[in-house]
């Protein structure tokens, strides 16, 4: 079997949800569903027109209220994790990455034991903050 260049492009665009325009108005449930389809959504703070995650969702859903992303996170449908970079991921994927959470030293230079020891006090403060205030976003 041979795939033409045009077919390969269309296959890639379709897999990313970019081949066709949205057929209906977006709903709140489309936010976690779209991120699930992509596997993750990088949290990028670049803000020329809008923050990157909002533009990525707009390109797939069309016009939608930007607060839906925060609402999906607050409802526990999404979680933040360092998957590739800082990313939003479907909470249902937690079981797929838990092994990485348990072995952060295998995630590269950012998680070396020496770094963890050097920042032990800050890490303890962060854990205490989460303990006192409950689940929080990285922005908190």
Regions found by a protein language model. Give the residues of each.
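Phosphate-backbone binding and catalysis cores of DNA-processing enzymes
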Residues: 1-140
């Amino acid at each position: 079997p041979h795939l033409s260049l045009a077919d390969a492009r269309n296959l890639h665009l379709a897999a990313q949800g970019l081949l066709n325009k949205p057929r209906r108005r977006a709903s709140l449930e489309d936010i976690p569903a779209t991120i699930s389809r992509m596997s993750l959504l990088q949290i990028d703070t670049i803000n020329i027109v809008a923050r990157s995650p909002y533009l990525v969702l707009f390109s797939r859903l069309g016009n939608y209220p930007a607060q839906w992303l925060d609402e999906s996170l607050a409802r526990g449908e999404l979680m933040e994790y360092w998957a590739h970079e800082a990313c939003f991921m479907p909470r249902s994927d937690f079981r797929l990455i838990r092994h990485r959470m348990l072995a952060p030293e295998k995630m590269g230079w950012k998680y070396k034991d020496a770094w963890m020891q050097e920042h032990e006090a800050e890490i303890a403060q962060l854990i205490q903050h989460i303990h006192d205030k409950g689940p929080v976003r990285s922005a908190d």
